[in-house]
Each structure stands twice: as structure tokens, then as C-alpha cells.
């Protein structure tokens, strides 16, 4: 949950117009879309967006983003502080081993969800 990505075709640099925010796992998209981020704060907002139960995914009255700001565009005093577990740390290595043990033969790097703190 919280994956951010782009629709694309097989050509390089083809992800240019359709993005998505995943509310729940959806294995049919695995290896077909380009992931570029993860929602680390505000997943409740993502889950509140309207969605379509239909296979075509078309929402008849979709929510609209009327204003979007990324943290780098905010005045310095308004930017959130985001802390992520260092991938060179002992706790990260322990997380990898615990995840590997839990997933067994199904383990992949995508199974590791780094702990994040946003203030």
C-alpha cells in the first residue's frame, strides 16, 4: 500500500502521463508499471480517494487535485522532517533477515518496507 508509480509501455521513457497511487496490493500490476515512490505520510488520504470497482478502472466522478506541492517547494519552515532507516545500519540488516525468514522462497527486495518517521 502507498506505492506511487506510472503507467508505461515497453519503450524507455514512456511513462509520461498516467500515474497511480496504490491503496492495496494488486499483483496484476507487478512488473508492468514503473514505481517511483511510496506514500510515507497521508496514506489515509490516498485510501479516501474515489475508485472504480469496475475492471476498466474508470471513475465516473473522480476526485481532482487542485493544488499539489512537493516538500522541496515549501518554505523551509513548513517542510516536514522525514527520517528513514539507513540501509547501511545493523537494524536494516536485521530487518532484511527477518523479512527473508518470514517470506522464505518468495522473498524479494520489494518485500522490505523501510520504517519512516514524518514530523
Residue ranges, per PLM feature:
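Cross-family detector of peptidyl-prolyl cis-trans isomerase
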Residues: 1-119
Amino acid at each position: 500500500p502507498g506505492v506511487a508509480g506510472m503507467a508505461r509501455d515497453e519503450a524507455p521513457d514512456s511513462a509520461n502521463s498516467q500515474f497511480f497511487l496504490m491503496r492495496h496490493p494488486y499483483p496484476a500490476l507487478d512488473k508492468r508499471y514503473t514505481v517511483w515512490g511510496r506514500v510515507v505520510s497521508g496514506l489515509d488520504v490516498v485510501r479516501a480517494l474515489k475508485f472504480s470497482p469496475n475492471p476498466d478502472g474508470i471513475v465516473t466522478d473522480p476526485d481532482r487535485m487542485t493544488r499539489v506541492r512537493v516538500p522541496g517547494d515549501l518554505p523551509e519552515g513548513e517542510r516536514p522532517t522525514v527520517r528513514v532507516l539507513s540501509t547501511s545500519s545493523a537494524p536494516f540488516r536485521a530487518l532484511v533477515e527477518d523479512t527473508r525468514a518470514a517470506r522464505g522462497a518468495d522473498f524479494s527486495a520489494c518485500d522490505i518496507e523501510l520504517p519512516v518517521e514524518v514530523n
